[in-house]
Amino acid sequence: MSEPLHPAEVRVLGALLEKEITTPEYYPLTVNALVNACNQKSNRDPVVNYTDEVVQQALALLRHKGLAVRISGSGHRVEKYGHLLGEKLNLGRRESAVLCMLMLRGPQTVGELRGRTERMYEFTELADVEHCLESLATRQPDPLVAPMPRGRWAQLLGGPPDPVAAEEPSAPPSDLEHRVTTLEREVAELKQTLESFRRQFE
């Protein structure tokens, strides 16, 4: 990336990427849905409280950089937004999952990434995650991730990582966090089931 992204741009782009993979039936997203995705308290670090205006400004910048697109017209009563990160950077599913999680949660260890990307891509073992990270770190002309102290990795779309954040150990996932993640997965599966059921009667 020739120009580092602002933190709001990173969060918006990460949220779009996450929702495309985990809840494709609701993608692309309206501004309101995207605000909620950016501000959700689970699976986010730091937790933010963006306004519609902040998200719309980030979208405008991302569109200017060719990383986001506005979708309107037939079939869409309101304007929706999608990302072009995969096309722009030639990312596969596993690279997208790892980069997305680093964008949404900041620097993480290989083990944390393997667990937290489960809904997006199921890595068989830690070595697979390491191989993916090494591939992203050696991208030319611009690496997308970089290794950090304490065995963690950071995304570089927003520029070099904060040295203070680099020294802070990542907190282990709490039992509550695990339960929330499980519930989110179950809700997403229920939504898909209900949507399939509804389509049978259309």
Where are these regions (language model features)?
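Amphipathic alpha-helical oligomerization/assembly segments
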Residues: P169-Q200
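Extended, charged alpha-helical interaction scaffolds
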Residues: L85-C132, Q140-L144
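Mid-protein regulatory/catalytic core that forms ligand/cofactor-binding pockets
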Residues: E130-A166, A171
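Helical coiled-coil/dimerization "stalks"
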Residues: R116-M120, P147-P160, Q192-E202
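A short, conserved structural fragment
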Residues: Q56-G73, L133-P149
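Short alpha-helical segments that sit at the start of domains
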Residues: M1-P28, S74-R105, A154-L157, E167-S170, ...
